[in-house]
Structures are given as C-alpha cells and as structure tokens.
Amino acid sequence: MMKPFREFAGLALPWLLALGLASCAATPSRAPANLTDAKLAVGNYIDSGTYHADITAVAAPAKQWILQRSQNSPEKLAVVFDIDETTLSNLKHMQAADWGYQAKVWDTWAHTASAPAILPMRDVYDTAVARKVAVFFITGRKEFTRRATVQNLRDQGMGHFQALIVRPNDSTNSAVLFKTAERKRITEQGYSIIANFGDQTSDLAGGYAERTFKLPNPFYLIP
C-alpha cells in the first residue's frame, strides 16, 4: 500500500529547497573572474619577477633589431614609443589606488613627474639614440600634461627625442585612430619607422611601422 505524501513531506521539502537553490546558482563558466583573486594574481605576477622578465624578453630582440636595421642605413630612421607602461611605470600609483582608476587622481599623479623608467625599455631607447635613430613618443596623455611628461622623461634619462606627441585636450578619437594618424604624419616627414613599442594592441594597430613590439600590461585595457 502506498504511503500518503504527508509522510514524505519532511524529507521532500529540504530536498526541493536544495534543488531550487542549486538551480539559482551562477553558472561558473559565465561568472567573471573574482576581483580579489585577480588583484592577487597581478601582485604575484609583479612580485615574482615575471613581469620584469616578460618586459626584458621583449626588449632584448628589439635592441638587436634596431642595431641590425640601422647598420649602414642611408634612410631617415625612427622608432615610436608609447609612454605609460611602455617607457614609464605607473606601478606606484596603481598600487596606491588598489588598481582602480579615477581621472582626477591620475592627473595629479601625472603632474608629479615621478614615474620611474622601465629599465629594459630605457636600454632600447638608449640603443636607438646611440644609433642616431630618431625617437618619437606618442602617448594617450593629454596636452595639459605635456610639461610634466617632458620633465619626467628627462629626469629618467629619456630627454633626447624628436617629438613628444600628446592628445589634444578635447580629443575624442580612439587610441588606434589617433596613434595611426600620428605615425602616418611621421612617415610623411620622410622617416621610416623601424619599430613601434606599446603595451596595448591599440598602440600598435594601424600600420606605419616595420615591426611592432608589445609589452605586457595586466593592469588595464585601452581599446
């Protein structure tokens, strides 16, 4: 004889509740990475020395390319460098901000002109200068930071350059459009850009460079 449902109610209700809760849980494959875990991973990437090693792994062949390409070349040669996380490091600022970004806080930091050089990339810069290859900096920084940026570059041993190209204060173009147009202008001045360095894909897309070299940047993305 089948027992009445009420005899199973005490067992069935917890099971049904558990099933309901399970069905409401986020699908792991759709959940974004945990923010705390992501911050810890970035910190470990830096503290372990892997970040520096990855930069060095980009800088070493870049130096060799500049030496090779500039050997007995009659052309007007140039290299293009991005600034933030390519030649100057903002780690101190980003760590103090717990990896967050606020425009006003960033502007204050930029005006301190205290970002240290990324040493392997300064070696690349020194190689270009020694081989009389013109250096151009093209940065997403705005015009109002120009003076501080020039001072920062000079203080960090990178004060010899053909031009520092910054974005107009009212610029709304994407990074790709802005930087591509500026590289095009450099080539129109008769230069052959033999290398373009950046930490964002948007620093390098758009052409007008024989070779591109991408530095690691796990901190932020500029589309």
Where in this protein do the model-derived segments appear?
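Active-site-adjacent structural elements in enzyme catalytic domains
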Residues: 74-95
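C-terminal cap/substrate-recognition subdomain and adjoining C-terminal extension
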Residues: 28-40, 53, 75, 133, ...
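Short, acidic loop-to-helix structural element flanking the phosphoryl-transfer center
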Residues: 106-136, 143-144
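Stable alpha-helical elements in mature extracytoplasmic
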Residues: 51-62, 117-124, 145, 149, ...
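Bacterial N-terminal signal peptides
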Residues: 11-22
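Non-catalytic pre-domain segments flanking phosphatase-related domains
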Residues: 4-5, 22-81
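Structured segments of extracytoplasmic/periplasmic soluble domains
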Residues: 61, 65-72, 91-94, 124-134, ...
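Metal-dependent phosphoesterase signature
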Residues: 88-117
